Each structure stands twice: as C-alpha cells, then as structure tokens.
Amino acid sequence: SGSAAESAVSALARRFGTLMGMTALVIGNGEMGRLTAALLRDAGCSVTVTLRSYRHGETVVPAGCSVVQYGERYSAMDGADVIVSATTSPHYTVTRERFAALERPPRAAVDLAIPRDIEPGVSEFTQLYNIDDLGVSCEIDPATLARARAAIDAHMERLHRWDNYR
C-alpha cells in the first residue's frame, strides 16, 4: 500500500513541480488514506481528511491534518488543489455530475481505489490519475495468498456440506 500512496504523491509533485502550499482533500481514512494524507502533509500540503460519522471506535487522523465529514466532501473539494480518494466503497465517492458543478474544481484527482472511487468522466474537468496510470502493482505475498486460498477452501467446504444437507 505504501507504493501506491508514494506513487500518487510523486505523480502530483511531477505534475505541479511542488506541492508546497497546496491544499489537498483525502477521501478515506483507512490505511491507504492515512498514509497518503501524511505524505501530502510532509510534501507541504494543507491536508483535509474525510471521516464517516457512523464509524465507531477511536479515529486516527495524521497529525496536522484537518477533518471534514464524508457527507461534506464536495464542499471541501471545491477550491482544493488536489483530491485523492482511497476507500473501499462499492460506489463512486466522486461523481462526474457533482464534480462538474464545483465552482473551483481541483486541478488534479487521484483514485487509489479498486473498484474505482472517482467516476472516469471527472477526467473531462481535471487531470485524473488511477492505479493503472501510476503503474502500481498489486502483488500479494505467498503467505497471504495461501491464507486466502485456505479461507476460500474452508468456506466452499461448508457451502458444499450445507448444499448436500438440504
């Protein structure tokens, strides 16, 4: 996950020459979002991170970053220089229609999510990068792959037993 966040920040730095003094909105406060927010902060950006109000437990936001509720993300991105979205949402966190309505749309957007967070049509209004553009590989270490396969096999065995029992 570090390589995707680093690639995103590097791509933005190449695009603008520097990120110093720029404003960034990071949508998503999972591991990838927090890492990206911290890297943007370290590059000199003023960073805002979205939070979902229904999540329980302790919320960790990188030091020096401000917070906005997820539902307020469009207000927060209006006037921001860059946005990065890194959620596990099954739907778009940024739609073409809502992005098109912004008075001062961000100059670049980075989508680190699989499946995509940012509707591809957003590219009509700003420079849009996604995981493929950044050349990030999603390699899985053999131990993790073995654990995943074992979990799938166990689940399939339970499913077959249930199906045979019916």
Task: Show the residue positions of the predicted features.
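Hydrophobic, well-ordered beta-alpha structural blocks that scaffold small-molecule cofactor pockets
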Residues: 1-86
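Short, well-ordered coil loops that connect the C-terminus of an alpha-helix to the N-terminus
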Residues: 18, 63, 89, 104-105, ...
